[in-house]
Amino acid sequence: MDAFDVIKTPIVSEKTMKLIEEENRLVFYVERKATKEDIKEAIKQLFNAEVAEVNTNITPKGQKKAYIKLKDEYNAGEVAASLGIY
């Protein structure tokens, strides 16, 4: 699966800003069929950042969210800034 097909859009809210600052996490809507391994590879390809863990859930609207924790040597704030959301 192509990295641009896996990652759809970042989620920007007060909650996600708090996750970026305090937990070094990013939150994206992702392709519903994407696995956690697909999401890890897409983040590595698109943002050159190593992923520590990926948690996913499917919203009642049927969209899949991925909560992506970056390894300590990478800063989620810098990745968010490169996206223009922080």
From Swiss-Prot:
Record Pfam families: Ribosomal_L23 (PF00276)
Keywords per UniProt: Ribonucleoprotein, Ribosomal protein, RNA-binding, rRNA-binding
An example molecular function term from Gene Ontology annotations: structural constituent of ribosome
InterPro entries, per database record: Nucleotide-bd_a/b_plait_sf (IPR012677), Ribosomal_uL23 (IPR019985), Ribosomal_uL23-like (IPR013025), Ribosomal_uL23/eL15/eS24_sf (IPR012678), Ribosomal_uL23_CS (IPR001014)
Key word Acetylation present: no
Biological process according to GO: translation
A single GO cellular-component term on record: ribonucleoprotein complex
Subunit (UniProt): Part of the 50S ribosomal subunit. Contacts protein L29.
Protein task: Binds to 23S rRNA. One of the proteins that surrounds the polypeptide exit tunnel on the outside of the ribosome.
Protein family per UniProt: Belongs to the universal ribosomal protein uL23 family.
NCBIfam families: PRK14548.1, uL23_arch
Record-given protein name: Large ribosomal subunit protein uL23
